[in-house]
């Protein structure tokens, strides 16, 4: 790893995750969130196929690349849909029959923010309990690394 992992735990919200990038989360932190999500996915299905996309921000592709590295490290197979809208990612779970989805977006937030909307159950994004589990997994991964 080239830089110290930075993840502000307050970025994990009820239904998604949002941070100022790179102030509150850096690339290594995004990679760890990808590992955490991958860990959740492989508990449901081994060798899962995950569709991933990103929004129009100039740094979103970079964030997506870190996130995908984390997913792949857990054994997930990733299909990158590239620059797209959130509904495209949600629809991909049905049209492409993917096992999980992730969208790199800060939605309506101003430039400087990044975020991740994700889901495993078809047609649904993570709920409070799943986001809490993800936060716990990521924090456990950090303790393991240190």
For every predicted segment, state its role.
Residues 2-10, 17-146:
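Gly/Ser-rich phosphate-binding catalytic loop and adjacent alpha/beta segment
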């Amino acid at each position: 790893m080239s830089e110290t992992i930075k993840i502000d735990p307050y970025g994990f919200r009820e239904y998604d995750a949002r941070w100022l990038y790179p102030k509150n989360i850096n690339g290594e932190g995004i990679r760890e969130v990808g590992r955490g999500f991958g860990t959740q996915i492989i508990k449901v299905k081994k060798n899962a196929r995950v569709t991933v996309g990103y929004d129009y921000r100039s740094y979103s592709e970079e964030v997506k690349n870190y996130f995908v590295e984390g997913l792949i490290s857990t054994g997930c197979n990733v299909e990158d849909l590239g620059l797209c809208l959130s509904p495209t990612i949600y629809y991909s779970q049905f049209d492409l029959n993917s096992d999980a989805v992730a969208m790199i977006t800060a939605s309506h937030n101003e430039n400087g923010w990044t975020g991740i909307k994700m889901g495993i159950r078809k047609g649904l994004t993570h709920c409070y309990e799943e986001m809490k589990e993800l936060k716990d997994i990521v924090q456990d991964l950090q303790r393991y690394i240190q």
